[in-house]
């Protein structure tokens, strides 16, 4: 599938149109950002790792009955996907306390959350992705009640699938974000799932194996990403 014009350039991916109006090419770049894009660095192999990682995870979710935008892997850093009408709200599932939740509530990092929390955030870097709720979504017309309920259902379903996948690999799925869109009126999982948008800890050492290594200047970012990929069975080379 030939990519044509650049449609959108995000913090770590570039989206291209194709000759098929229903399909897009996602190009995963080596860029890594923090602080809503204020800090950006490049890491060799990162685009390739995240692309293959994302393709692997999306394939697992498809097998579990979760509709995704994934079509097929095109190259080391490109994938073909369905063109979705994206919902401007991201879903976050939290299995343990970390990140903004710890700061907001003053609770201990790593606290087990049972049942897992479901949060919603408006996708807006300038406003630092403010937290919203279902009432905001309905009032401002970001997504209707039925589609939001489906997004919630699919988020928890994905959590069940992925928590087991990572647990079997000696990892804790602490939290993660998902983005959804509509394709022919149906809610479909879009964007990506990678260590960029999730928190993954080693089950024995509690070492952070995700983008917190970049946010907190811990070093070893790509080594951690590749180790997670290796453990769950992603073929990188």
Swiss-Prot record:
GO MF annotation list: ATP binding; phosphoribosylaminoimidazolesuccinocarboxamide synthase activity
* The protein's annotated pathway: Purine metabolism; IMP biosynthesis via de novo pathway; 5-amino-1-(5-phospho-D-ribosyl)imidazole-4-carboxamide from 5-amino-1-(5-phospho-D-ribosyl)imidazole-4-carboxylate: step 1/2
Give the enzyme's EC designation. Answer: 6.3.2.6
What are the boundaries of the signal sequence?
none
Q: What class of enzyme is it?
A: ligase
Keyword Signal in annotation = no
Reading the lineage from the top rank, the first entry is: Bacteria
Pfam assignment, any one: SAICAR_synt
Question: What Gene3D superfamilies does the record point to?
Answer: ATP-grasp fold, B domain, Phosphorylase Kinase, domain 1
Keyword annotations for this protein?
ATP-binding, Ligase, Nucleotide-binding, Purine biosynthesis
Q: Which GO BP terms, alphabetically? A: 'de novo' IMP biosynthetic process; cobalamin biosynthetic process
* Reactions that this protein is recorded to catalyse: 5-amino-1-(5-phospho-D-ribosyl)imidazole-4-carboxylate + L-aspartate + ATP = (2S)-2-[5-amino-1-(5-phospho-beta-D-ribosyl)imidazole-4-carboxamido]succinate + ADP + phosphate + 2 H(+)
Q: Which InterPro entries match?
A: SAICAR_synt/ADE2_N, SAICAR_synt_PurC, SAICAR_synth, SAICAR_synthetase, SAICAR_synthetase_CS
Please provide, in alphabetical order, the Gene Ontology terms of the cellular component aspect for this entry: cytosol
Q: Which PANTHER family match?
A: MULTIFUNCTIONAL PROTEIN ADE2, SI:DKEY-6E2.2
Its family remark reads: Belongs to the SAICAR synthetase family.
Protein name as catalogued: Phosphoribosylaminoimidazole-succinocarboxamide synthase
